[in-house]
Amino acid sequence: MESIPNQLPAGRDSSCSPNSKDLQSYSGPPLKPNQVSETSLYGIPIVSLVIDGQERLCLAQISNTLLKNYSYNEIHNRRVALGITCVQCTPVQLEILRRAGAMPISSRRCGMITKREAERLCKSFLGAHSPPKLPENFAFDVSHECAWGSRGNFIPARYNSSRAKCIKCSFCNMYFSPNKFIFHSHRTPESKYTQPDAANFNSWRRHLKLSDKNSSDDVIHAWEDVKAMFNGGSRKRTLPIGRSESSPSQPPRGQTQGEPSDVPHKTLRCEDDRVNVTMPSSIRSYPVIPVPSKSFGMLQKIPPPLFPHPYGFPAFGLCQKKDDGEVMGEPNKTNLSGVFWPSPKDSAYTSFPMFWPTTGSLAMPTYHHAQPKPPSDVLCARHNELDVSEQSDRSTSTPKDSLLDNERCSSTQSTRNEEDKSGDESRSIEGIPPTSRKISYISAFRPVVKDVESIAKLYGNRGPYSGPRSGYMSPDFLSESSSYRSVSPDVDSVDDPDVDVESHKAHEDEECLQLSVDDRRSPHSLTLAQSEGVKGQDQENTQMHTLNDLHSTNSSETRPSDMESHGNKHTTRFEVYARERDEHVHQMSTSYFGSATTYQRETSVKDVHEEEPSSTVEEMEPKNHQDENNISEERLKEPNDVCADEEAICKDTGNRGSLIEKNIESMAKEELQKQLVEQVELRKKLEREFQNLKDSFQDQMKRELSYREEMVQQLQIVREAHDALHHFSCKMLTPRHCTGTCTFKPPLLPP
């Protein structure tokens, strides 16, 4: 009983209807109740028991022998769909089946089906689903009793799919598919309404019956065969891999006992059968897209197939290995190394772009598993699988740049989840050393402007912009920094050298950036140098120099010969700080010296307010408020009046006071006067804006106060109305108990 195929009878055609020999048990002498016998079903002996004058077979024994390669759920669903009713055993009958060896000792219940039903059930799983041999113009006279009921002609010649309109209604002459016909009814004078039991689209086989109750056995069997045709999806549509091609409508006749039958197998239930089964060697050399089948459950339950899969493709990417003699091992080593999850070591096929078409035969990157690998392996794998066109476009860049661009490649690699991580997290996963990233923290948002000059002007104070990469002119790539890189900018910007690969202007940009950052960081030392150089001037001239000393650095950048002689002295001593620390010192100096550095920032990025929509009114309000508070502080504060933080900054940068002093002296008086006028105009403009904000805020406060007063009045009216209504209801309903002064007045809302 272990090997099913070898015990099939030699001349038995599994697709034909049972002949009279198989039905001889029905035509014999009358059967005794609970009579035990043994019946051969597909060559397997099955215990049968006489119940209610009918010989019934043990369904559990059939499931454990003939259908042992199918799950209990599959067998149950197919039995229900075929309309096979299961009769439960009594405890006495169950004990008889136990002693006959059909049921194990631990069994609690057993279902019994007739031999004809058992043959139909096994045939739906094991037999070839060829249409029954019927006359050419034959039609079944069928009817159903769902709702008001209906009657029609089922034409088998039209029944070529599960949704084929093969039933012609006898009342309206319209054609319906079987699953729709049971919902189609006509009310006749003698019909009565019947609420159908479990009438859904898949239960038509239960509700659709032959109109003639006394039909011949041939018609009944043909009707059963027709009902079993497209039931639950036939697994005989494509032949198994490695088998010789023959038409499915002509099954092989006269198989010898040594030949394996073409019995398709599906989900295994017995774990013992999975060991020592070799796979066939005829594996196709191209991958196919797996189409999931309805009857497959979760992926964890799918083991390696026992026999060649009946589909032309393995389901859910269960690609078989290329090794011919390799044994599919233990059940806990089930391999899902297929199309969806290819791992580098055990995938049978190479990486192949099956979901997104490519031009020509370009190799595309696969989905890499997150396996622990040394960084060099990851780099080599990434470089080998780069697109050919990308490599030709970026041949001028360094390997570091091509690696970074590979991380930002197209949607086939689905790196959006990597961008959601921080920079350190994604770097540690991929094994890339932290020094392989460029510093190009421009913005977390994509700039709208497309030309390079306006971007450089827009982000002029934030660092050198290297321009967009050649070959990528879309706005998506204009901003070099991804969203996860601008989360923590000072991770990379402390140690990495700021190298611009394309323009090779790193040295000049670094010196200019150092001077501008250092000068912005030390406004108090500049004021000390001024006070030593221009002691004879009055307080107003001191304010003028304080306002304009920072612009001397911006104007002196156009004279690099004058700057580089002084800049080289201090290049080795000062490094470019991260932008957060720069802005922190910038805010500290603003609080001590009014709005001098604020004005410097406003004039150098004049276009920011027009081009950047992100500078909102809420951001300007505290800055303007700080400016207004510091108007009087400028005229009252002496240059020597400093705090401890300022002295620490002064110690770092005090020796550069002479440099700025020379620059200020070299400037013409007209330039200073011109810049002072600009600063005064800016101050007036900011004061006007702040006054407008203040007025609008006061108006809003007044509106809110009036709204609150109105709400208080409304609540008072509601409270009074509630009290009056309650008093009136007390008076109307209980006139003898309420004397007009009702004490029960629960407040509707708190006062």
Curated annotation (Swiss-Prot):
Low complexity composition bias: residue spans: 479-491
GO molecular function, one term: SMAD binding
Annotated coiled-coil segments of the chain: 666-704
Record keywords: Coiled coil, Nucleus, Repressor, Transcription, Transcription regulation
Protein role: May inhibit BMP signaling.
Name listed for the protein in its UniProt record: SKI family transcriptional corepressor 1 homolog-B
Keyword Lipid biosynthesis attributed: no
InterPro entries: c-SKI_SMAD4-bd_dom (IPR014890), DNA-bd_dom_put_sf (IPR009061), SAND-like_dom_sf (IPR010919), SKI/SNO/DAC (IPR003380), Ski_DNA-bd_sf (IPR037000), Tscrpt_reg_SKI_SnoN (IPR023216)
Subcellular location: Nucleus
Compositional bias per record (Basic and acidic residues), positions renumbered to this chain: 416-428, 559-569, 603-612, 620-635
UniProt cross-references to PANTHER family, sorted A to Z: SKI FAMILY TRANSCRIPTIONAL COREPRESSOR 1, SKI ONCOGENE-RELATED
Gene3D superfamilies: SAND domain-like, Ski
Entries under Pfam families matching the protein: c-SKI_SMAD_bind, Ski_Sno_DHD
GO terms classed as biological process: negative regulation of BMP signaling pathway; negative regulation of transcription by RNA polymerase II
A GO cellular component entry from the record: transcription regulator complex
Start-end of Polar residues biased regions: 14-27, 244-259, 539-558
